[in-house]
């Protein structure tokens, strides 16, 4: 059997188009594997790609071979077993494969094809048909962190920072400046000596005087040092304020009796999006999970999403706990503070004004951005309208949106985190 397979080597990134075509061809397999990986992974475990397995029967390469179809009339000389007109059965095909049983001595099989997709490709399939905003990281004033940058040339510095090229250039210029007149005089004397030797070879007195002058000028030139401390040039490095690269994300979720499991799942997917955005913009991220009903508690991720604890609804308990944690562990001059709150909007009516006061006076002045998503198909209640007043006071750092179904998550996320033009 003859096979024709393209195995030509490709330079760096020259097979990108082929890889993209391959990903499009097996998009259903890859998307299914990514969905399974997302359900299996932790919210913070999005740092790598994923291994994708595709059944061997789906990835057969196009080949040229002798087909086994059709009928032929052939004369076989010396045949003693068959007569004209009889049909010869086809030889059986290979019986390779996998599964329990005894080993065979013939046939061929093919394992599943396994390949790795990158983190970028993983996120592309995870957020298919979506476009995460490219946000510019905000600089923090009063930061205590700095980075060292080049700031030109200095005449003083550490020997390890010497600029050899600039030093030699300076030394060459100094030597020319200090010995330029002597070199010009030396050239004139040498020309005169050459003329005398050519035209008046018997004039020994003048020739000796010129030779003595040449020695004197050469000695003067040689006394100019090749390198002087004045010539030394150093790379100047200065400290430049560097924005803090640490961020903390507070995830606040209502787990009262009115929050169904479907509502919690929508909240989880929103929190994953927010976490990935922060991870791409900051070197260090802390995630603080706060669950609340009538009271609030800081919990781990497992309990945050899967605990069955429930009760009434007092949203202010979560905001008070968040403010306490900020004061104890996350000073605003060192940390970029973000918050995402998810709720179905149900709250004790007398508590909604308290939530507004806590946010305006104790939280909003210290956070980079605060988002509130209300997951409900119903009309808004008192909490939403109190938060609207906060949005008016902090239009640049507070945003609220409504989610009705999982299909609303990504459009709402883009709306909340779209790039804003700075004027």
Curated annotation (Swiss-Prot):
Stretch list, region Disordered: 83-108
Compositionally skewed regions (Gly residues) per UniProt: 92-107
First and last residue of the signal peptide: none
InterPro entries: UPF0229, vWFA_dom_sf
Superkingdom: Bacteria
Similarity-based family: Belongs to the UPF0229 family.
Name of protein: UPF0229 protein Pfl01_5140
């Amino acid at each position: 059997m003859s096979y024709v397979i393209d195995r030509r080597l490709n330079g760096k990134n020259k097979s990108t188009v082929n890889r993209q075509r391959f990903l499009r061809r097996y998009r259903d397999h890859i998307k299914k594997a990514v969905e399974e990986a997302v359900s299996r992974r932790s919210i913070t475990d999005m740092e790598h790609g994923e291994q994708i397995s595709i059944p061997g029967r789906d990835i057969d390469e196009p080949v040229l071979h002798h087909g086994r179809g059709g009928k032929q009339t052939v004369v076989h000389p010396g045949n003693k077993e068959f007569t004209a007109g009889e049909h010869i059965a086809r030889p059986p095909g290979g019986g390779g494969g996998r599964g329990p049983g005894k080993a065979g001595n013939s046939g061929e099989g093919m394992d599943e094809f396994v390949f790795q997709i990158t983190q970028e490709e993983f996120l592309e399939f995870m957020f298919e048909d979506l476009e995460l905003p490219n946000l510019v990281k905000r600089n923090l004033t009063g930061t205590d962190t700095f980075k060292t940058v080049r700031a030109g040339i200095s005449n003083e510095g550490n020997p390890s920072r010497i600029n050899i090229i600039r030093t030699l250039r300076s030394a060459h210029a100094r030597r020319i400046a200090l010995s330029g007149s002597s070199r010009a005089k030396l050239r004139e004397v040498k020309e005169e000596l050459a003329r005398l030797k050519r035209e008046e070879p018997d004039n020994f007195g003048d020739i000796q005087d010129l030779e003595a002058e040449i020695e004197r000028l050469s000695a003067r030139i040689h006394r100019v040092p090749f390198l002087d401390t004045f010539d030394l040039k150093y790379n100047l490095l200065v400290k430049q304020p560097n924005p803090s690269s640490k961020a903390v994300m507070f995830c606040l979720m209502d787990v009262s009796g009115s929050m169904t499991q479907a509502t919690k799942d929508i909240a989880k997917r929103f929190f994953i999006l927010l976490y990935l955005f922060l991870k791409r913009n900051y070197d260090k991220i802390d995630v603080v999970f706060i669950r609340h009903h009538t009271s609030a508690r800081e919990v781990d991720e497992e309990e945050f999403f899967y605990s069955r604890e429930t009760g009434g609804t007092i949203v202010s308990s979560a905001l008070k706990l968040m403010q306490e944690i900020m004061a104890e562990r996350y000073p605003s001059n060192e940390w970029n503070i973000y918050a995402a709150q998810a709720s179905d909007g149900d709250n004790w009516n007398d508590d909604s004004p308290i939530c507004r006061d806590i946010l305006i006076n104790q939280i909003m002045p210290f956070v980079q951005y605060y988002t509130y998503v209300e997951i409900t198909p119903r009309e808004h209640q008192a909490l939403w309208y109190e938060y609207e007043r906060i949005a008016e006071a902090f239009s640049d750092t507070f945003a609220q949106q409504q989610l009705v179904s999982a299909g609303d998550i990504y459009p709402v996320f883009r709306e909340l985190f779209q790039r804003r033009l700075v004027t």
